[in-house]
UniProtKB/Swiss-Prot annotation:
Family classification: Belongs to the ClpX chaperone family.
Binding of Zn(2+), residues: 13, 16, 35, 38
Species this chain originates from: Streptococcus pyogenes serotype M6 (strain ATCC BAA-946 / MGAS10394)
One GO location term (cellular component): HslUV protease complex
UniProt name for this protein: ATP-dependent Clp protease ATP-binding subunit ClpX
Amino acid sequence: MAGSRTNDIKVYCSFCGKSQDDVKKIIAGNNVFICNECVALSQEIIKEELAEKVLADLTEVPKPKELLDVLNQYVVGQDRAKRALSVAVYNHYKRVSFTESRDDDDVDLQKSNILMIGPTGSGKTFLAQTLAKSLNVPFAIADATSLTEAGYVGEDVENILLKLIQAADYNVERAERGIIYVDEIDKIAKKGENVSITRDVSGEGVQQALLKIIEGTVASVPPQGGRKHPNQEMIQIDTKNILFIVGGAFDGIEEIVKQRLGEKVIGFGQNSRKIDDNASYMQEIISEDIQKFGLIPEFIGRLPVVAALEQLNTSDLIRILTEPRNALVKQYQALLSYDGVELEFDKAALEAIATKAIERKTGARGLRSIIEETMLDIMFEIPSQEDVTKVRITKAAVEGKSKPVLETA
């Protein structure tokens, strides 16, 4: 029961001793009373303790080698990118820990947000997810193509922050130490190097809007998402310690690199540098190339760490299918084991799955759908066939020319 009187008897707060006449409201419980002032004080104490806990959780930041070891357990290949990410993430959270305890005269450490460049299915999103999971920090994913600048139909950039707050169970202090991955960042590049006289709703304007939250600001976020409205209650979140990782395929950027290095698409330059393939050109990318592609200089400047990922080949995809701790083959073997059935993939079948993924240009993200297509009928029938003890997936089964081989007791 809440109120200021109980049977016309004056009541007092059990914590501070103030009477009902000295405070706005007293809440009555089971033989105990608490005033609105003590409730507010309790909330403040809890908030401070939660903030201290969040900071304490980040004081022991895994070292770059430890982060790399975690990535190696789940991510195949991309060794150079994994090293760059491990160092950048370590430095970021050391900076967060340092900033919280620094004196005014100490060096001001800048954020090291990350730009990942690599083809579809090369593992950009999965790398970011794995890092966040290993650090036990909130993680949110956003698609840059869904964003528009304020005043236009679409999603405000502040809604990215809402996703992170939701991932932190609305614990703002914890969200302020989280990681946000923005995918398809190349899709909001300016159309050409010259600024258009028409309004670029999902291009440079979105880059400018993202720039503010990436570099660090106190943003007002609508708790239910959507557009902001007058008199709407907002969640205030400081983005200065949020790590932003942005990624995109940047199709065609290798041609920009070739031109900068002096190697023409047609003919040969006398001073050209010869590099074997496009994958190697990706490792040569500098900020000048990214700017020429269409990202504005201010935006590039807030992404000092650039990690280039390579196109995955057949061998890489086969390793992804079989080697990581959560490899897809292991997952499907576990699924069938619950029905008492052993699952085996022929080597040729794994090669066929990898080849299909490359042909579809889906990379690693397309592997699961190919296995699902191959095993749909098997997973439907096996639970009802108690005499089946083993399923063998062949190359012909992957190619749709025959059914998987069944062995019975």
